[in-house]
Amino acid sequence: GSDGRARNPGLPGWCETPVADRKVEPGCYTTASSELGAVPIEPLYWHLDTFPDRTTAESRRAARSVVVDGHGKHWLFTIAEQAWRPVGGDRVAMVGPLVVDRDTPYTARYMETVIPPGFQEGRGPGHRHPGPEAWFLVAGGQCLETPNGVMTARAGQSMLAPEGWPMAIASLGTETRRAVVLVLHRSSQPYVQRI
């Protein structure tokens, strides 16, 4: 079935609860969702920049940018071509290219995760997305199991999974995993599909 929920029954937020409605810190929460419409022809990347305050971050927004407060920072998340840069701020990462179909409307769904050590997605094949999923790890580590191999990332690193890949995610190491997440999904479909 594809009820739009990630298979995280033991994880507060289920990746759908808005971060403003969070009752406890651990979990997966939506921080923003932005309809981008049809995307341009050039390859796209997820640009992650931080600013000293939210007002400055808001003033640096581009057409496909959102400002998110999370993990103690004021983030400017932007979907743009590789050469794009905001005025000022600190460049944290650029993840991509994000492979998408041209002339297809997409929505950028951003999430924040705080996952204790030892977390594993429910047994079974996991979930998939109708578009690429990208992570930037602020702290801790994660392991992503797919039929195409296992990927790992640790604090300061990013990870990218293409559209449609079945995946199951787990925490790696003994530190709480803190990450910001993007699912750039086809607007006509739920952002997540259980397998």
Give names to the regions the model predicted:
Residues G1-F136, G141-I195:
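Jelly-roll (double-stranded beta-helix
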